[in-house]
Amino acid sequence: AQHYADLGLNNQLRNPVSNLLENRNDKWSIRTMSNAYFEVKPIKGLTLRTSVNFTTNAAKQDYYQSAFLLGKSYTGNKSTPDLTSIDGYRLSGFGYNAYWSTTATYDVTFNEKHHLNTMIGYDFEYNSDFEVQQDDRTDSDNPIAYNNTSITNVNGAKLWTGSSEYSNYVFDAMFARLVYDYNYKYVLSGSVRRDRSSKFGPDKRAGWFYSGSLAWNITEEDFMKDIHWLDIAKLRASYGITGNDQIGNDYAWISTISSDQNVVFGTTAIPTYYPSGYSNRQLGWEKNKQMDLGFDIGVFNALNIVVDLYKRTSDIVMPANIPNFNGIAGSVYMNAGQIENKGIEIQVSATPFKGDFSWETTLSWSKNNNK
C-alpha cells in the first residue's frame, strides 16, 4: 500500500492528515506599546509639548518537518536514528523602538487681519532588533520532536548550524515651520529641517530639507464679494525637497564580506572569504524634489474643480556593480539613480441633488510622464 505521506495520484498534493500530524510550525509573538506626553501653555498662544513612545516586539517559532513527509519509512528510534532529510529550525527574536518628540508652537493673531503660526521641534528615534536561529537539516534524530540536541553527527549527517542577526538604527531631526496669512486672502508657509540617519556614511548622515508654498484666495477679495455664484477660487504654488532614508539596508555604506569555496591546505579544507560589498562614506539621502501649481474653483455650491500640475524628481540609492577589470567582484551602494515624473491631475465633483435625497459624483483624470 502507498505510504500515507506520499504524493497523491496527481503527484502534487500530500494527504492533508500527514501534514497535520507530521508537520509542526508553532509561532508565538507579543507586542507592547506605551506612550506618554506632557503639555503646558505658559502664556497665551504658546504651547510646549513633549511625548515619548516605546514599542517592543518578541517572537518565537518552532518548525519541524519529519521524514514521513518525504515518503520515508520510520525504522529508527531515539538511540539508533536513521531517518533522512528531516528539516527543523527554532527562531527567536526581540526588538524595540523608542521615539521622543518635543515641540514649541506659537499661534497669534494681531490687528485682526494678521495670523501667524510658528513651530520649532526636535525628534529622536532609536530602533534595535536581534534575531537568532538554530537549524538542523540533517540525517540526525528528530531534534525538536525528541528535544535531543546531544546527537550531532549520525550516518554522515551535517552538524547543527546556527545564525544570528543584529541591527540598530538611529535618527534625529531639528525642524522649524512658519505659516502666515493675511485676512484669509494670502497664505505663506515655509519649513526647514535638518535630519540625521545612521543608515548613511559619516560624511553624509546629515541632510537639509526645506519647502515653501503660496496661496491666493481670490474669493476673499473685495471685488469678488458680489459674485455670489462663485463659492471658491484659489491659486496655489509650492516647492519642496524632502529626504528618505528607508532604503531597505541599515548598513548599506559599510563593507561586507561573504564566504566562498574552501581551499585545501594539505588535508585540511580552509574556508575563504571575499569582499562582496564596498564601503561608500559618501552615500547620502534620497532626495525628492516636488513642484506644484494648482487652482480650485467651486460654483453654485454644487460643482468643484481641482487642477494640479506637478513635477517630481527623486534620487535613488541603489547597488552598482564594480567592473570586473578591477579584479574583484561585488557592488557598492551609491546615489546612482533618478526618476522624474511630471503631469497633470484633474478632479471634478458634483452634487446635483441635496436634501432628503442627495447624489454626489466624482470624476478624476490624470496624465503622467515618467523617465
Feature locations, PLM:
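Extracellular/periplasmic, surface-exposed regions of secreted and cell-surface proteins
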Residues: 2-65, 76-371
